[in-house]
Structure formats: C-alpha cells, structure tokens
Amino acid sequence: MERINFIKSVLGASAFVGISLAACNEKESLQSLIDNTKRKVTGKMFNFSCAKIEKVKVGIIGLGNRGSTLLQMFKYLIEKDYAEIIALCDIQSKKTKRASSILSKWQKNSADVYNSSDDDWKKVAKRDDIDLVIIATPWRMHTPMSLFCMENNKHVACEVPIAYKLEDCWKLTQTSEKTQKHCIMLENCNYNTEELWILNMIDEGVFGDITHTEGAYLHDLRALLLDDEYYQGQWRLKQHATRNGNFYTTHGLGPISFYLKIGRGDTFSYLTSMSTREKNLSSAAKQINHPMNSFKCGDMNNTLIKTKKGKSILLQFDVHTGRPYSRINKVVGTKAVHDGYPSRLYIDSEKPEYWGHSWLDKIEYDKYKQKYEHPIIKKLKKISQNFKQGHGGMDFIMIYRLIRCLNLGLPLDINIYDSVMWSAVTPLSELSTNNESQSIKFPDFTSGIWSKENDLEIMREI
C-alpha cells in the first residue's frame, strides 16, 4: 500500500484507471503507469499569440518572499503605462498590507486587496478586468490555481515548479490549449546575464555542435528550511520528509533547454536518477532540536537525461549540504566549453593538441563577453541595475519581457510546453530514484510538434 500511495502521489490518482498494480516493480508496468497519464494534446500553443493588450491588468496571488519581490519588478512597467497591478492576494493581511504600501509609492491607483479567506484567490481569478495572474504561492497550489485562472479567461505566469505530478502537467497543457491562454513558468535564470551570453554564443556558432550540458541547484537551504517563518508552515521542509528526487529542476534545466532548443527541434528522450543517503538536513535539525528530524530526500540527487538527438544533460540537486551556491552551467560543444561558478570559457584550437589546454585569460574572456553580449542585456542592462533585489536584475528582465510580449501581441519567451517539460523531470526523477535508477521515457506533451525546427523566442528584440 505504501508503494501504491507513493506512485499515486507522483503520477496523480487518475493514472490508475484500468491499470493493474500487482506487478508495478516491473519496468514495463511502471512505464505503463506513466504512459497512462497521457491526455490528448495538439501542440498548438507553440508560437501562440493573443491580441495586443495596451496596458496589462495584473493580479498577484501570494505575497510572501517571492511574490513581494515580483511585485517590485513592475515599478518601471507601471511608470511606462505598460501594466497596472489591480489585485493583491495573500492569506496573511500583513503581507497584503506590506504589498499595498510598496505599490502606493509608484502606482497612483491602489489595488484591491484579498485576504479574508483561503479561497479569496478565486475572486481574483473570476474578475473580468484582469488579463494576467501572477502565482507565487507554495508548490501544492501552483497547478490548481493555474488551471482555475485559465478556466476563468486569464493568462497565467506561475512560479517554479508549475507542477510536480505528471497528470498535472497534462492537465495544464490541455487546459492552456483549450482556453487559448498563455500559461508559463517564471524561470528567471533563463534571463540571467551569463546564461543569455552563452545562449548568444551558441546561436552565433561559437560552441559548434553541443554534445553535453550540466546544470544544478546547489544551494544550502538548511537554515531557511528549518526556520519557523521563512516558508509559511514550513511547507518546503515537509516536501523533504516525504519525497526523494530532484524537486527543483528548472534553474539548471531551463537555460539548458534553450541551449539545446528543446521543443524546437529536439526533446527529452529518457532519464535515470539516483539520490545519495540523507545526512546533513537531519543533523542540522537535531542540532536545534527541531521537531522534524527525519527526511526521505537524499542530500544529493543526480539525474541524467538523454535527448532525441543524442545529447546528454546532467542535473544535480542539493539543498542540504554546506557549500557555495552553484548552478554549474556547463556547456560542452565541438568548438568550445563553458564552466560556471566561476564563469570560465575554453575555445578549442583548430588542430587537436596533446596538452596545454587552458581556460581563456581574463583579457580574452572579456573580449568574448563584450562581443557576444545578448541583445536583451544590451537593451536592459542600465534599467535592470535599479532592480538588484530581483536576483541581480534577472527577475526584472523576465517580467519586462512577459509584459512587453503581451503588450505587443507576441508569443512569450517560455510557453506551456517548456513549463511542463521542465517540471516533469521532478516526478520522473522520483520514480527512477525509488526504482533503483530505472530508465524512464519522457512523455511527449507537444503531440510531436517538438520536432519542428523553430527559433527561440528569447532571441527576438522587442
């Protein structure tokens, strides 16, 4: 029964209609359970654009650590009359009060406040004067809120991950296609200066043919996870008590997917995943006599993904271990290699060398930095300096691009298929990790449209 409950929690309850669970240890049976989550989709939200929205009317649901930061990213857009915040929602009145105070400094009209009940967010979704809903709530609410908002005629921009069950990935895709509403995940690392620089070099042919990439979320979160207030109700810590896999895939995988043009000529084929034993988080919990001190999630998860074109991706996840922050950001090509944290670039010589391989010195490195700076950074670098609180400025660039695409009636940089493909790695990693690193095939959320070669929307100048 425990195993059945685990698989249900990862796939979703309806995955089990007509499927025998008696032999779910067998490879074919597990893959059948995954395949049984599939829903009919069309892929028609690729290159989807809606009518121009001269001023985007925005509602924000969730005004904690993340939501309050995203709110601040709207200052420039509001001053330029590109957007207006008209609804603020959180279950804690102190958070809506704080958000209203921030907003009053640079928006003339005050936003309506919703904080009277756990379901007040539905009132925001049902309003007929809102174009876009920003969702920045605990993970378990991301999918139901996104679905409800789309069903009530709203575009959705949701914090990461947009889903952590396969069935929910299918529901989100199907609902976006049915309602013809944008539904995207707010993956800010795709807008970071380093990642955009690498992407531009790839686009210009500096790396040649990409063969391998590595990304990660290596971030010591022990103090925050164990804090009584930082994650309300310690919702994030509870995930580590009951699950084991890669819970936070998208900071590494989002940029990598753009490097490899996933969904635009290539896609994920299969993965295998394993976790180490857990030691660090429980040790930290015991040191402070925390009531929760037993955790299922291993200290480090390693997930390997193979693409249809034969390229490989290594994703790592570790928020338990004391170490400097890193997303790795490794790109290996036939002509160049990049390693992040700190950023280093190697350019291969025209002829193979026996030895003497070394990273570019600072002078040569800086030449590449200047020559291949991404057009988005060139345009927004100065403005983004005023929004350093948004992860150094990349949060602002992300929100700017979102709103301007809606203003101009353009396809968004990140679409629903990107969002669910990147998020689906989490449940698949859990299934593989808990089944002796079994190789698991990826579902196709695009109905085969991924095979069409298309340019990345993020390479457009707007």
Where are these regions (language model features)?
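C-terminal helical cap and adjacent loop that interface with cofactors, partners, or active-site loops
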Residues: 10, 29-30, 36-46, 69, ...
